[in-house]
Structure formats: C-alpha cells, structure tokens
Design a protein with these regions (language model features):
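Glycine-centered loop/turn positions within well-structured domains
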Residues: 110, 148, 193, 258-259, ...
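Conserved, mostly hydrophobic/aromatic
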Residues: 170, 187, 223, 251, ...
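Proteins enriched for Cys/Gly/acidic motifs involved in redox and nucleic-acid/cofactor modification
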Residues: 1-195, 234, 245, 249, ...
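Conserved SAM/AdoMet-binding glycine-rich loop
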Residues: 78-83, 88, 93, 179-303, ...
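Short acidic, glycine/proline-rich loop/turn micro-motifs
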Residues: 261-264, 332-336
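Active-site proximal loops enriched in glycine and acidic residues that flank catalytic Cys/His/Asp
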Residues: 189, 225, 253-255, 291-295, ...
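Terminal RNA-binding accessory module
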Residues: 336-440
Length: 440
C-alpha cells in the first residue's frame, strides 16, 4: 500500500481471549493501516465475534447486522468478520449475510492478515498493540483450544485441540508488554492448568509462572481459567512463595453434585472438589478464590440445586459468578439430554444463588475494613483513582475507589499515577466494591 493509509476499526466482542487475538492482529497490520477507534467512516470495519453461548451469539449476530446496515448506508467501507461465531458457522453465515465482504475463523489469524494485503511477519508473532491510553494490566493467552470434553461446551470444536504457547514465546510477549508499561499479567486459556502437556509432556504452569516473574517491570501475575481435575499442586507452591504470583485463583467448578458433575463430564466428584478447595486454603493462607457455577443443567433437580447452595454457603468463595444452562448444538448435552429445566426455574435458581453469594462477598469485604493494602491504579475518574489489590481481578471483580489527595501524592499529576502502586487503608465496603484512603 502507498500514499495515505486506509483507516481500520476493530470491534471486539466476547471474552478476554478475543481481545488478545485482536491485539495480535493489530500488531501485524499497524504499519499498513491507520487504526481508529471510531467505526464511522472507517475504510475497513472488522468484527471479532463470540459464538460460545446463546446470548453471546445473539450479540455478535446483532453487531454484524448493524455493521452491514452501516455499510449499506455508506458509513463504512469493507466489512470483515472473524472470531468464534464465524468459525462455528463458517458454512452457513456467508450465504445468510452476503453483504459481509469476508468471513474468517478463530484458530488462525493469517488468512485475515493476508486478506488485508499484509504478509504475516514472524518477528511480530509475540507482539501486540494495546489500545490507546495508559494501561496497568494485560491478558496473556498461554494456550489455544481445549482437550477437555465437557458435555455442555462448544469450545473444542470452535477453537480446536489444546495447543500450548512455548515458554520462551510467552516470556518474549510478556517482556514486550512490560516495556509498554504493563504491571500485571492475567494468564488466560481454556484451561490454564493443562498448560505444557502437549509440548513438554508435563504440566508446566508453575515453570511458566517462575519465568514470567523474572521479567523486570511485571509485579503481579494472576491465574484465570484453572481446572479442578488433576490440578498441579506446584502452582500452589508458586502462589504461596513467589511474591509476584497473586494469592488469587479463578477455578470454574460449575457444580458440586456428583450426579451433575458426571453428566457434565467434569472428571471430578464432589468429594474431590471439596478436598481441593480445602487444600488451596491450607497451602495458600489468605488466598481469594473465584469460581463459576451453572444452574439448570440437565440432571439438576431441587436436591442437586440445594446441594450446590449448601456447598457455596460453606465454601465461602470470595468471588462467584453463575450462568443459566444454555443448550448448544453439537455438544454432548444437546445430542443426548433434554433441556428439561424450565427457563423460569433456571432464573429463580440463578437469583437465589447470587443472593446467597452477595451476602458472602459483602461479609468478606466488610472484614477488610481497616486493613492497609497495596493497590494498582487502573484509572482516574472524577477525582477518584480506580484501583485493585491482588485480590481483585480486572473486569470481573469489584474495585477499590480512592479519592485523589494532592498532599499525600505530593501534588503529582493524577493521570501520571495510572499503572503505579500505592498503599491504601480500606474505610468502607459494599457487596462488591471498597473505598479507601491513601496512606504513606
């Protein structure tokens, strides 16, 4: 390309893994395009879609339809769609939406990069373009795909088999992020605790944590999307003894009933799950646990749901999210079980579970009032810093709001403080957020 660069905008839908894919894409094409934040009048509009569950698919389809309308009205030039939705329905969507100029999958960005007139550069494989502004954290995708076959999940046939990124490549990528001012890495994958089995023939997450912690500038490393079956205990050793590894674990459990776990193909039972949670709390004192549950899965009757409620009450997860079961075509569930739990019952169970969790989260937050914690400043808005401690993960957990104090900050420009650490005394708490004051 010569002369004025064409403008290109990307809209990213879905999870943090999609965001990482977008950032890798932009690194490859940034020399050939002018990357813009506004979709209006962009020469190229790219949509990175999600196709995981019903609500996400609907959101992505609506986004494509709206973008197609804008293209028809002359507001955008070329319209290209990639990601999980197009990967999942690559055979059907081009016929249904011919106004889209190109459909690309989620497993390999190279066809899309080439369609944009750029030859993929090997030296840019571990580079990413972080969006405009100052950032304190970044997601680091350590593997692609999944070898698990949970009965409800469509990810394996969307994203393919598990494929670990070599440690040296991740260290290179993380070092590049640190050079851009990133202080916290959030490790993500479909199953982070499976990391390394395919290329090193053993679980290597603990080794990766150690290598990442040796990077200058990286201060916090956080683990998301761990899996309970065959959980590698050396990861807990890293968490307990490596000061850069946050005492925080995201471990989606999905249920506690033996019957439901078996139908879900989770490869654990309730006793194993309870023992693992106890071991985590014993080996890593003060660890904060985040989990995810599914309500309304086939086989979940009143008895199984009450068992789940009792487990959540006793386990006292500091963070918990929950979803209503969504039947997905092509999964084992869809082919073998009827979705017999009514939508009303699913919603009632979801409401009941989240009401219980609200009280647990509030009690945890109240217990922190009066404590002094190290926090990372993510944003500055309307006279307040938006911060997190090692016990809050970005984008999914609550925040710690701290009023800017020019005397305590020695009159520093508040915007220059984004991405730095300060000590804060917690003074107030609600169910999900905290308020604190700066301390010396």
């Amino acid at each position: 390309m010569s002369g004025k660069k064409p403008t290109l905008a990307v809209v990213t839908l879905g999870c943090s893994k999609n965001q990482v894919d977008t950032e890798h894409l932009l690194a490859q094409i940034q020399d050939n395009y002018s990357i813009v934040n506004s979709e209006s009048n962009a020469d190229y509009l790219l949509l990175n879609t999600c196709g995981f569950i019903g609500d996400a698919k609907e959101e992505s389809i609506q986004a494509v339809l709206e973008a197609a309308k804008r293209k028809k009205n002359g507001e955008v030039g070329k319209l290209l769609v990639f990601g999980c939705l197009s990967q999942r329905y690559i055979g059907e969507l081009p016929k249904l939406m011919p106004e889209v100029d190109g459909w690309f999958g989620a497993r390999d960005l190279n066809p899309l990069i080439k369609a944009l007139g750029v030859e993929p550069k090997k030296e840019m494989l571990n580079r990413r373009v972080i969006s405009d502004g100052v950032h304190s954290y970044a997601f680091l995708k350590i593997s692609e795909g999944c070898d698990r076959r949970c009965s409800y999940c469509a990810i394996p046939f969307i994203r393919g088999a598990h494929k670990s990124v070599p440690i040296e490549d991740l260290v290179d990528e993380a070092s590049s992020l640190a050079a851009q001012g990133i202080k916290e890495l959030v490790l993500i994958a479909q199953d982070t605790t499976y990391y390394g089995l395919d290329i090193y023939h053993h679980r290597a997450l603990a080794e990766l944590l150690q290598k990442l912690s040796e990077i200058d500038g990286i201060e916090w490393i956080r683990i998301h999307y761990s899996y309970p079956a065959d959980f590698p205990e050396d990861v807990l050793d890293q968490m307990a003894h490596n000061p850069k590894v946050c005492k925080y674990m995201d471990i989606p459990l999905q249920h506690i009933s033996d019957k439901v776990l078996d139908m879900m193909h989770r490869h654990v039972d309730g006793a194993w799950t309870r023992a693992l949670i106890q071991k985590m709390r014993e080996k890593v004192p003060g660890v904060v646990l985040r989990t995810t549950m599914i309500v309304g899965h086939p086989g979940e009757g009143p008895k199984e749901f009450e068992e789940l409620m009792d487990f959540v009450l006793k386990a006292k997860f500091e963070r918990l999210g929950a979803f209503k079961y969504s039947e997905e075509e092509g999964t084992f569930d869809a082919d073998n079980f009827k979705d017999t739990v009514s939508e009303k019952t699913k919603q009632n169970r979801l409401n009941k579970l989240m009401a219980l969790q609200s009280g647990i989260s509030f009690a945890f937050n109240k217990s922190r009032v009066g404590s002094v914690v190290k926090v990372l400043i993510d944003e500055y808005n309307d006279g307040n810093f938006v911060c997190r401690s090692e016990y809050e993960s970005p984008e999914v957990d609550g925040e710690i709001l701290v009023k800017y104090d020019s005397s305590a900050m020695r009159a520093k420009d508040p915007m220059s403080m984004i991405g730095t650490f300060i000590n804060v005394k917690i003074t107030q708490a609600d169910e999900y957020d905290l308020i604190g004051d700066i301390v010396d």
